[in-house]
Amino acid sequence: MVLLDPLANALSTIKNAEAIGKSSCIIRPASKNIGNVLKVMQDLGYIGEFEFIDDGKAGIYSVTLVGRVNKCGAIKPRYSVGTGSFERWEKQFLPAKNFGALIITTSSGVMSQYEAREKKIGGQLLAYVY
């Protein structure tokens, strides 16, 4: 079986584990992109600690959940956003203003839309979380 979108799979694993009340979950396969998204989610306070575990294959992430994720998901296709168009995408993917976050990949790395707006840079949408 071929895994077409590892990021979407990782985010749905987190969402499902939160929905049934688990305190941790395992994400496999691991990638740098998934690790960067997890780091942004951790900085925003949606997940606790996470660690990379080398299993001899692609590796796995062990994620500690804190019960703050209501919904999260990958955004497909990866829409390009400019510095002035964040509000349009916030209205489309987030339930209310200043509630939740869009995760964006930029030339300066993966960050939330708040950080990208502060630095005045655009990029491509990866995911949303609230």
From Swiss-Prot:
InterPro entries on file: Ribosomal_uS8 (IPR000630), Ribosomal_uS8_CS (IPR047863), Ribosomal_uS8_sf (IPR035987)
Record flagged with keyword Ubl conjugation: no
GO CC annotations, alphabetized: ribonucleoprotein complex; ribosome
Pfam families associated with the record: Ribosomal_S8 (PF00410)
Keyword NADP: no
Entry-linked PROSITE patterns: RIBOSOMAL_S8
Gene Ontology molecular functions: rRNA binding; structural constituent of ribosome
Keywords from the UniProt entry: Ribonucleoprotein, Ribosomal protein, RNA-binding, rRNA-binding
SUPFAM superfamilies named among the record's database cross-references: Ribosomal protein S8 (SSF56047)
Record GO biological process: translation
Stated role: One of the primary rRNA binding proteins, it binds directly to 16S rRNA central domain where it helps coordinate assembly of the platform of the 30S subunit.
Family: Belongs to the universal ribosomal protein uS8 family.
Subunit structure: Part of the 30S ribosomal subunit.
HAMAP family, sorted: Ribosomal_uS8_A
Protein name per Swiss-Prot or TrEMBL: Small ribosomal subunit protein uS8
Species of the source: Methanosarcina barkeri (strain Fusaro / DSM 804)
Gene name, Swiss-Prot/TrEMBL: rps8
